């Protein structure tokens, strides 16, 4: 169940307030430097929390935003199938290039096996590599039963995640859902935060995710969503 403050925060939210909880995202692998320049500049103009880009685009995005907002990047994306050491190295690399937040994809196979110790170990290795940045752990929530999602959230949080995140936006199972956000929010309580991403394409959905307990949104169509607030 969403906290009452989550519901009240979403009601009457201003354009500026909504932008401040958005990671303006461009993760298409074919994105060009011109695309990165555009999205990074948009994120600054909107007043977003961050611009979220692929590792190869971090340095360029950091140059464009020039410290005015944060740069976020992804690790083990989108499948989560890299070994933990590789994820840790990738995380350290993107931080060195200018990322202040890291969104890692957890070992989805381990989740499917119910091996929550392996899930925690995967997260812990990345956490150890980048101890001073915000770490968000992508669980690909559409794949799992409520029970597995709860246990995955606990495992990620226990291993040092600052956020648990619903989705990559690339899996055919789907993106964020109100039910998944509500479950994840109920587990984390005040100990961590929730990022909803994937299939958030309009203002009503964005506000519903926040009302369900999301603290951050990952979206690509930020301008249209903000325009829904006038």
Positions of PLM-derived features:
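C-terminal alpha-helical cap/extension of soluble enzyme domains
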Residues: 1-22, 28, 46, 190-230
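Catalytic cores of alpha/beta
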Residues: 82-93, 144-155, 182, 190, ...
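Hydrophobic faces of well-ordered beta-strands that scaffold small-molecule active sites
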Residues: 18-26, 51-53, 70-75, 102-104, ...
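Glycine-rich phosphate-binding active-site loops on the catalytic face of alpha/beta enzymes
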Residues: 73, 77-78, 96-111, 158-174, ...
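Conserved, mostly hydrophobic/aromatic
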Residues: 23, 61, 94, 137, ...
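Alpha-helix-loop-beta-strand connector modules within alpha/beta enzyme cores
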Residues: 55-79, 114-144, 174-198
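Conserved anion-binding
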Residues: 80, 91-92, 101-163, 167-170
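Conserved N-terminal beta1-alpha1 strand-loop-helix module at the mouth
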Residues: 2-97, 150-151, 155-158
């Amino acid at each position: 169940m969403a906290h009452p403050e989550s519901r009240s925060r979403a009601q009457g939210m201003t354009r500026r307030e909504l932008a401040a909880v958005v990671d303006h995202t461009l993760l298409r692998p074919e994105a060009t430097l011109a695309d990165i320049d555009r999205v990074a500049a948009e994120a600054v103009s909107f007043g977003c929390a961050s611009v979220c880009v692929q590792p190869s685009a971090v340095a360029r995005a950091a140059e464009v935003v020039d410290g005015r907002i944060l740069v976020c990047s992804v690790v083990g994306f989108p499948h989560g199938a890299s070994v933990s050491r590789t994820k840790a190295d990738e995380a350290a690399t993107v931080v060195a290039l200018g990322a202040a937040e890291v969104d890692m994809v957890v070992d989805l196979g381990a989740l499917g096996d119910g091996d929550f110790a392996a899930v925690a170990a995967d997260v812990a290795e990345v956490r150890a590599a980048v101890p001073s940045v915000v770490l968000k752990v992508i669980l690909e929530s559409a794949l799992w039963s409520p029970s597995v999602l709860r246990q995955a959230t606990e495992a990620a949080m226990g291993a040092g995640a600052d956020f648990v995140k619903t989705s990559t936006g690339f899996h055919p199972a789907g993106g964020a859902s109100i039910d998944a956000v509500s479950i994840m929010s109920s587990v984390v309580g005040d100990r961590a935060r929730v990022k909803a991403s994937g299939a958030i394409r309009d203002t009503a959905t964005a506000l519903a995710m926040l009302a369900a307990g999301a603290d951050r949104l990952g979206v690509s169509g930020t301008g249209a969503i903000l325009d829904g607030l006038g």
